[in-house]
Amino acid sequence: MTKLENPVLMATIGGAQGLRGEVRAKAYTADPGALGDYGHLHSMDGRSFEVLEIREMKNVVVVRFRGVNDRNAAEALNGLELYIERDNLPDEELDEDEFYYADLEGLEARDDKGVSYGTVTGVFDFGAGDLLELKGPGKRPVLIPFSEASVLEIDLEAGTLLIDPLAAGLVDDPEELSKFTPDKPKKKK
């Protein structure tokens, strides 16, 4: 049983494929066929899965795991999410303007005046470009485009995003920006 400290979702298993224990899976990697390149995949209940074979098929990959040898065993995995440890992702392969979704979650979104618009709670791609979900205390979640116009700077070390609230669609009128005041840190007693 493996407990992941910083899990990153890599794939979700769909239905069984054929009679030999293969499964269809939705891979969340840039190259779906590279799903097995990250080592063993893990479920949140502690099981570990070794990829033996993988092939791409339309919008999914077909995967054969060690120990999953028949259709019944494959069907039992339907809906299972598979993760790896964040440390297993290769940082050196990223370009300067590329980020892992997992690294963006938890960053605080602020404008150039220091006004906080919430924390990144999710990153989504519905087909028209990536979106960041921001959630602030007592506020409903909002989605903003993850684009150069909306997100001006990302500082992983400081845990912040510098955003343009007008380009992000958080305000409709530039005059509204002057009404916001920066969040003041609370004094320690």
UniProtKB/Swiss-Prot annotation:
One of its GO terms (biological process) is ribosomal small subunit biogenesis. It comes from the Bacteria. InterPro entries: PRC-brl_dom (IPR027275), PRC_barrel-like_sf (IPR011033), RimM (IPR011961), RimM_N (IPR002676), RimM_N_sf (IPR036976), Transl_B-barrel_sf (IPR009000). An accessory protein needed during the final step in the assembly of 30S ribosomal subunit, possibly for assembly of the head region. Essential for efficient processing of 16S rRNA. May be needed both before and after RbfA during the maturation of 16S rRNA. It has affinity for free ribosomal 30S subunits but not for 70S ribosomes. Binds ribosomal protein uS19. The PRC barrel domain binds ribosomal protein uS19. NCBIfam families: 16S_RimM. This is Ribosome maturation factor RimM. The lineage of its organism: Bacteria, Pseudomonadati, Pseudomonadota, Alphaproteobacteria, Hyphomicrobiales. The gene is rimM.
